[in-house]
Amino acid sequence: LAVAGESAEFCTPGVHIGLFCSTPMVALSRNLGRKHAMEMLLTGDRIKASEAARMGLVNRIVSKGSALTEAMNIATLIATKSPATIAIGKRAFYEQAEMTLEDAYRYASNVMVENMLARDAEEGIGAFMEKRPPNWTK
């Protein structure tokens, strides 16, 4: 996840001096569509925070000086969720990305079964039905 201040700018300027930004390329190619990543890498042009958000490079834009606070707010919100479920989800997200579409759906179905059988799923559904906060496993 990424939070940027409204005045933030992003670029891969190496091409201006005869260097291709190959290490930033790895992150860009995994977080943006090919066309957006290639445009940034081949032009070296600066993009504003609003364009970065439109492209999917950042999740949120906040007022100057509040990016860290907003990032902590997001982290705090995530920390209220089941640690086991977050771990299952993160693992599945990254593992399926390397699979064929068919294999990814098969894998995701297995992950869903694994998740549904987990104690925290039972606790979360029970808490929802009983209108109380869940007590996640630690």
What role is predicted for each listed range?
Residues G44-E51:
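Acidic, divalent-metal-coordinating active-site segment for phosphoryl/phosphodiester hydrolysis
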Residues V3-A8, V58-R106, V113, R119, ...:
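C-terminal long alpha-helix characteristic of the crotonase
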Residues L117-A121, A127:
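Interdomain hinge/lid region at the active-site interface
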Residues G126-K138:
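Terminal low-complexity tails and localization/encapsulation signals of metabolic enzymes
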Residues L28, A52, G89, F128:
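Terminal peptide-recognition signature
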Residues L1-M40, M55, E70:
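CoA-thioester-processing core
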Residues P24-A27, H36, I88, A108-M112, ...:
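Hydrophobic alpha-helical segments typical of transmembrane helices
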Residues M55-G56, K131:
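Structural motif
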